[in-house]
């Protein structure tokens, strides 16, 4: 799927690549959508992400917590980038996958908001949780990873270090002009002051 795309990939081609009969794939997953979800869950299960998340959640130091987050994002990208990319691509053409993908994004938003809420005492003065969550979402995005590592040739170590230092700079030591919306201002109307 990563090379041919979601629409062009068939169960028959997946089975041929895996060296099994198509019926084996159908018996195990039923369809491509379920196979994609199985791939996503397997990547998560086989990674260090749950351990890193638990470690970050209990880390009292805000800087160290963000370093652990950067390590977690790197781990996710190294193990799951192709699956994340396929899922996004499939969501653009398959309404059922789009609904699944929306749930993944909603879960991600909740996870990031919880992470920031737990970090709130360490946030830079004047930085509200909503803005901090938006920044964490943006900087942890798979497209930034792809641009820096795949397109610009950065090593995974360099990416992780950049992400950690960027998150620390943006969330703990806030630059001038990055405060959240003023009272009564919507998040879509944010401006730098």
Q: In which residue ranges do the predicted regions lie?
A:
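Helix-turn-helix
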Residues: 2-34, 38
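Amphipathic alpha-helical linker/stalk segments
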Residues: 16, 23, 37-69
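Conserved catalytic core of Hanks-type protein kinase domains
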Residues: 28, 76, 138-139
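Short helix-capping/turn signature of helix-turn-helix
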Residues: 29, 89-94, 142
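Residues in soluble alpha-helical coiled-coils and helical-bundle/repeat scaffolds
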Residues: 30-34, 78, 92, 106, ...
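Amphipathic alpha-helical packing segments from all-alpha helical-bundle domains
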Residues: 67-88, 95-123, 130-134, 161, ...
